């Protein structure tokens, strides 16, 4: 979740240009609806508030699909053991006041007293994290767009499908827990948050993965580490504000994200082992397009730039920053030993050089941007009852 440089159009490694993330222009569907409305023959159909008009589909060469079929036994041995049995997993209720307890109201009162000490800008970051987690239907859908690894039936016994469903089930607890905690604090406008979640799921996401599992697993590797960092930082902040229970909540979620990061980075590590040239080209492609955050189409019905504003607050508080983005890239380059790859094609060597030298360039650009930065404006956030928060 959180801050990432804005997406810009760039050619992919398979030779097809990538488009922008969103458009405020009128789509053909909307234009047709407007014509219909003028003659009063029908209502305007639903359209998502954020639409992506230029998308690339099915860039994976057919012969590459066989790789993922052959990796089924490997995936069973190396991925499924990273999942926790349900009976041994934590559940949201483990961290919340027990509604059947005589002390329930006292526990809620204590929770609300602790929450009073937490500033609005922190809640903006926490809500943004929670909204991102709550859009889980979109992320399962995204994984099931990937050729060669999707769940073909909804209950497929293939290892890839079992992993995706179980991963989704584990992730589902994150949004549930943060949502219930937020509700009990009384500090945030739950209806505005709920609207934001509905808008976001309706808009979907555009990660630029092109139905291609190479791109998809590179994306999830980056994202799981990003969410691990973000939740870890919100845990640290909560502890500083004196809310040890909230710190425990965020830290527990961060630990899940770290385990999921391990799984996805293992997949990409295996792809580098068996198909290094195509994998490094895919890595460079994703980094040229820039890793968009899962909630980049966020909207609350009011703020057309809600994601950018939320990201700016997260950057200022140190919850998730441009430096984190560069650090994640550097971590993955080292984790996958990209600099040590040999036997690459000419295009592969250029891709290798690009990803291995990108992190320092991102840091330099960020340092220049910070040096030029002016006093950030203060704007209202609907999530905290339109109270103003500095970006």
Swiss-Prot record:
Fe cation 2 binds at residues 171, 224, 257, 260. GO terms for cellular component: chloroplast stroma. GO terms for biological process: fatty acid biosynthetic process. SUPFAM superfamilies: Ferritin-like. Its EC number is 1.14.19.2. The keyword Membrane does not apply. The keyword Chloroplast applies. Converts stearoyl-ACP to oleoyl-ACP by introduction of a cis double bond between carbons 9 and 10 of the acyl chain. Belongs to the fatty acid desaturase type 2 family. This is Stearoyl-[acyl-carrier-protein] 9-desaturase 5, chloroplastic. It comes from Oryza sativa subsp. indica (Rice).
